[in-house]
């Protein structure tokens, strides 16, 4: 765990320091969340080689700056699934690996905003532990990893409480951080005062990492349930003086009975005493949800109040489409802080602002400081994905994938089947006569919006077409049945 001294997250140049109050006062702390950015720094589709204003951190950044102008006190956190998801991510991890002395483009862009804390999602483990160690700056004490490595790092504190090193039996990274701040408040007469506060931030991720990245993690890491980790560390955080505790859960909501291996334990985690606010993710959904049929309706979920079992909560979509904002109403009694749960508020601020006269969606402008930071890497990734790899004599599409057998899935199944058949013939000849069946899923079938489909025309193929057919760096597994 760590105790970090930090100044308030504001873009203001006002250096006035009001007097400290020993009398009652009130303040608002705005917790700002990004989640599941998946390396979408730019509003750009590397699979179509085209701009796409419907997502991108460069637009979320605009919302962050606006929120910092609105609120005197902010805490900006990232909820994981940050370093994987685009061709640029794969380029920096596997094609032209980013050197130790440089930050990942995603982290470099985030540095322009000054994040206060973050946690790890399941996709942070997709490239293996040595790479994760490098991009976090070194220090992971795990078998097969150089703990002494000193690299550029991510630029903000990481906290994760429920993933442990098998080597040390200690958390992979610090389980929580406690940020010491000066917070702008008002006394009972409305006079501006400045008061000290300690903000605790604790992280949790889904135990599913041990299945999804088994080849990298087995024997090196193990997980604990989010509830068990919270019960262990929350009292410790309070004992160290945390006035407010924010839980970063890379997981969402599931109404099933609790299990330590539960993928989305938000409903159960919210019941652990000591959590004042909870930011969620992983499910690429939204909370609170103003839709007529909201995604989450389990007992304890209040979409109107933005609470989960009374805890102010948000889930800010994915790919930078929204910023989660939790307003915590704080009370100072002259000696310590408390949270007024009756006055809290949770909301999503979307980058989509509405529609124009023609019915076309409109979006907030990009933050002009972001794109120049990664321009050279952005262009390098584009050139890489343009590399020719062959041609196709049939259209490969996921249009209507939910009701048929599309060409884009057929080609993936054919490739998987041929790969496994060749492997079995060469390495497991005793099974060479067995038929090989393949199963694949349409990764792009409209979930992320109207343009979220694969549609590769007849003709030449490049790397970006192959990446469009299969988005993730998954591993092929064959099971004898």
Predicted regions and their residues:
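C-terminal motif of bacterial Sec signal peptides marking the signal peptidase cleavage site
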Residues: 4-6
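Acidic, metal/ion-coordinating pockets
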Residues: 18-348, 411-419, 427
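Non-catalytic terminal accessory segments
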Residues: 11, 17-26, 39, 55-57, ...
